Regions:
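GH16 jelly-roll
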Residues: 1-161
Length: 161
């Protein structure tokens, strides 16, 4: 668990209908306040039914699901080779990057608990779902086997004096 920093993963995505790889974070207080009140930072979501497209999202009590804090980005070569997916998370803003290119910034003026639950510790999750409400429901079984290849995951934080 940690609060604030630069978080990145260098990964090669699996491709095909029904696949749903993700690199994301949840508020460490999820057991106390439940989702979405704990906050969620989706650094990367890819769904095989939408080629060349990635999603970055923030989920809060005020904004969860496919809302204003979900950014859908077309990247022509996202299915080839390795790519760097990262987020810069500070007390003021959350910035999302793909291959060091800024694709979305969330910097609300009003930081109530409903809008900004991002001032507490979070933890990382990386997973590959098959099907599901976002990745499916149809799965093309002919695509298997597939791999979600992770080169590295890094978290950088400023030192406190």
């Amino acid at each position: 668990e940690f609060r604030y920093g630069n978080i990145e993963v260098r990964a090669k995505l699996p491709i095909g209908r029904g696949l749903w790889p993700a690199f994301w974070m949840l508020g460490a207080n999820i057991d106390q306040v439940n989702w979405p009140d704990c906050g969620e930072i989706d650094i990367l979501e890819y769904v095989g039914k939408e080629p060349k497209t990635i999603y970055t999202s923030l989920h809060t009590k005020d904004s969860h699901g496919n809302t204003i804090n979900t950014k859908k980005t077309i990247i022509e070569d996202i299915e080839t080779g390795f790519h760097l997916f990262s987020v810069n998370w500070t007390s003021d803003k959350i910035e999302f990057f793909v291959d060091s290119t800024l694709i979305y910034t969330f910097r609300p003026e009003d930081k109530t608990e409903d809008i900004w639950p991002f001032d507490q510790p979070f933890y990382l999750i990386i997973n590959l779902a098959i099907g599901g409400n976002f990745g499916g429901p149809e799965v093309d079984d002919s695509i298997f086997p597939q791999e979600f290849i992770i080169d590295y995951i890094k978290v950088y934080q400023e030192r406190k004096n």
